[in-house]
């Protein structure tokens, strides 16, 4: 008996409906399968699934940090002048209108830590076994601008690393509370156990790092190297690139260490006293202990764990530390001198062949106003595209291509109130490279 027409249509309709349901279920199953393959909590970091393009796409979709507005970050990082000019013009229009994230914003958003970490897109899992097996320690000294601190922390954060944060005792209470609120969301980020009031160019800047050194050595995290940062620093390498660079040091340290000029020698010729600021006295200092020749550098270092241990425990190191406490800007000659001391692990000899400039060391990339100029005429770098503070460039978008060509781990100075576009593009660049291993 033949099936009537309406029955045929009904069967065909049921068939199409079922086929549609099965297709929908297949799509859902495929998406779920992709998500499960990228479940970093249960996935082998060396597995093909984790390293696959599909998995990386899923990760990047959830963790990307695209620049706001319509600036061309890919072009800016490649040095495309049209993209750079557009970003600089855009910055002139928006920087006066831009409202930075406030202490109150962070106090509110961190009430729910999981929401905070997800919304601010912190990477909460190791991206490779190499990174997992090579934890890095950070000493982060801050005193203002909570947004700068949070963005720096997000940029250098990895769950296998360990972070000590020193907040200036003189900082506003709301700032200190906001820092505490942020770090309370991470098991591997903590406040230094001893906080000091930090006075510019005085011993207290070194003491802040020493306090973090003591705390970090007490940590159960088997970190290999210590990097120190301030609030205007930002990384220019991914965590994976940092691990590779630190492994290549093979136990050596990396920091500026050069023969001081006569001008710099005056910094330790007379004693300085501290009240609300640093004052020069007429009291002459004795020569450095242990007939140690003095060297000069900057406040930043890439130091091995063994070096840090000897800073705190070696009697000769302790004598030098006591001696520099009443000098001007001791952070700019203490580390540089210890780096040349023969008893310090990872140090290099006194000989002039081992002098290390800030451009040779990997600790920090800085543009000094006095050295800017025409590169074709021998200047080390082109003029700053941002502004200057204490003769140091606060970077603009026009500096980013040059920045990324250098081998340093971090650069200084950045400030979103001066140029947020350069920071946004650097964030986008680093996040893309962290996930994919390639540039924008």
UniProtKB/Swiss-Prot annotation:
- Subcellular compartments: Golgi apparatus membrane
Is the Cell membrane keyword given for this protein?
Answer: no
Highest taxon of source: Eukaryota
Q: What is its EC number?
A: 2.4.1.102, 2.4.1.148, 2.4.1.150
Q: Which family does it belong to?
A: Belongs to the glycosyltransferase 14 family.
Q: Which GO terms describe its molecular function?
A: acetylgalactosaminyl-O-glycosyl-glycoprotein beta-1,6-N-acetylglucosaminyltransferase activity; beta-1,3-galactosyl-O-glycosyl-glycoprotein beta-1,6-N-acetylglucosaminyltransferase activity; N-acetyllactosaminide beta-1,6-N-acetylglucosaminyltransferase activity
Q: Which residues form a coiled coil?
A: none
Mind telling me which InterPro entries this protein's record contains? Glyco_trans_14
Could you tell me what this protein is called? Answer: Beta-1,3-galactosyl-O-glycosyl-glycoprotein beta-1,6-N-acetylglucosaminyltransferase 3
Q: Which residues lie on this side of the membrane: Cytoplasmic?
A: 1-12
Q: Please give an example of a GO cellular component term from this record.
A: Golgi membrane
Per the record, what ranges lie on the membrane's Lumenal side?
31-440
Q: In which pathway does it act?
A: Protein modification; protein glycosylation
Q: What does this protein do?
A: Glycosyltransferase that can synthesize all known mucin beta 6 N-acetylglucosaminides. Mediates core 2 and core 4 O-glycan branching, 2 important steps in mucin-type biosynthesis. Also has I-branching enzyme activity by converting linear into branched poly-N-acetyllactosaminoglycans, leading to introduce the blood group I antigen during embryonic development.
UniProt PTM: N-glycosylated.
> Which reaction(s) does the protein catalyse, per the Swiss-Prot or TrEMBL entry?
a 3-O-[beta-D-galactosyl-(1->3)-N-acetyl-alpha-D-galactosaminyl]-L-seryl-[protein] + UDP-N-acetyl-alpha-D-glucosamine = 3-O-{beta-D-galactosyl-(1->3)-[N-acetyl-beta-D-glucosaminyl-(1->6)]-N-acetyl-alpha-D-galactosaminyl}-L-seryl-[protein] + UDP + H(+); a 3-O-[beta-D-galactosyl-(1->3)-N-acetyl-alpha-D-galactosaminyl]-L-threonyl-[protein] + UDP-N-acetyl-alpha-D-glucosamine = a 3-O-{beta-D-galactosyl-(1->3)-[N-acetyl-beta-D-glucosaminyl-(1->6)]-N-acetyl-alpha-D-galactosaminyl}-L-threonyl-[protein] + UDP + H(+); a beta-D-Gal-(1->4)-beta-D-GlcNAc-(1->3)-beta-D-Gal-(1->4)-beta-D-GlcNAc derivative + UDP-N-acetyl-alpha-D-glucosamine = a beta-D-Gal-(1->4)-beta-D-GlcNAc-(1->3)-[beta-D-GlcNAc-(1->6)]-beta-D-Gal-(1->4)-N-acetyl-beta-D-glucosaminyl derivative + UDP + H(+); 3-O-[N-acetyl-beta-D-glucosaminyl-(1->3)-N-acetyl-alpha-D-galactosaminyl]-L-seryl-[protein] + UDP-N-acetyl-alpha-D-glucosamine = 3-O-[N-acetyl-beta-D-glucosaminyl-(1->3)-[N-acetyl-beta-D-glucosaminyl-(1->6)]-N-acetyl-alpha-D-galactosaminyl]-L-seryl-[protein] + UDP + H(+)
Alphabetical keyword list? Disulfide bond, Glycoprotein, Glycosyltransferase, Golgi apparatus, Membrane, Signal-anchor, Transferase, Transmembrane, Transmembrane helix
Which species expresses this protein natively?
Bos mutus grunniens (Wild yak)
């Amino acid at each position: 008996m033949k099936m009537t027409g309406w029955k045929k249509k009904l069967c065909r309709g049921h068939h199409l409906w079922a086929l549609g349901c099965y297709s929908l279920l297949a799509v859902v199953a495929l998406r779920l399968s992709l998500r499960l393959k990228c479940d970093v909590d249960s996935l082998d970091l060396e597995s093909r699934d984790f390293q696959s393009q599909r998995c990386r796409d899923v990760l990047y979709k959830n963790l990307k940090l695209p620049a706001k507005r319509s600036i061309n970050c890919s072009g800016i990082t490649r040095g495309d002048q049209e993209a750079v000019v557009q970003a600089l013009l855009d910055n002139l229009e928006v920087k006066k209108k831009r409202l930075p994230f406030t202490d109150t914003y962070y106090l509110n958003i961190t009430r729910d830590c999981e929401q905070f970490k997800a919304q601010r897109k912190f990477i909460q899992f190791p991206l490779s076994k190499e990174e997992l097996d090579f934890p890095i320690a950070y000493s982060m000294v801050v005193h203002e601008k909570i947004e700068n601190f949070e963005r720096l922390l997000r940029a250098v954060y990895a769950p296998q690393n360990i972070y000590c944060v020193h907040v200036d005792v003189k900082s506003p209470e709301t700032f200190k509370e906001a820092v505490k609120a942020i770090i309370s969301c991470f098991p591997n980020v903590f406040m230094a156990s001893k906080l000091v009031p930090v006075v510019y160019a005085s011993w207290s800047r070194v003491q802040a790092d020493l306090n973090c050194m003591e705390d970090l050595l007490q940590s159960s995290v088997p970190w290999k190297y210590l990097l120190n940062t301030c609030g205007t620093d930002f990384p220019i390498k991914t965590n994976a690139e940092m691990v590779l660079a630190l492994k290549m040091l093979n136990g050596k340290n990396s920091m500026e260490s050069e023969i001081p000029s006569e001008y710099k020698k005056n910094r330790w010729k007379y004693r300085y006293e501290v009240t609300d600021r640093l004052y020069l006295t007429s009291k002459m200092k004795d020569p450095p202990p242990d007939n140690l020749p003095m060297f000069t550098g900057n406040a930043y270092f890439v130091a091995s764990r063994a070096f840090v241990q000897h800073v705190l425990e070696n009697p000769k190191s302790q004598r030098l530390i006591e001696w520099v406490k009443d000098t001007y800007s001791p952070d700019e000659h203490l580390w540089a001198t210890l780096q040349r001391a023969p008893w310090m692990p990872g140090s290099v000899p006194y000989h002039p062949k081992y002098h290390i400039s800030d451009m040779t060391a990997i600790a920090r990339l800085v543009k000094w106003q006095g050295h800017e100029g025409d590169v074709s005429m021998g200047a080390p770098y082109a003029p700053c595209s941002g502004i200057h503070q204490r003769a140091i460039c606060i970077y603009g978008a026009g500096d980013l291509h040059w920045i990324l060509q250098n081998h340093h781990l971090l650069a200084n100075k950045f400030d979103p109130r001066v140029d947020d576009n350069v920071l946004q593009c650097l964030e986008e660049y680093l996040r893309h490279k962290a996930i994919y291993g390639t540039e924008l």
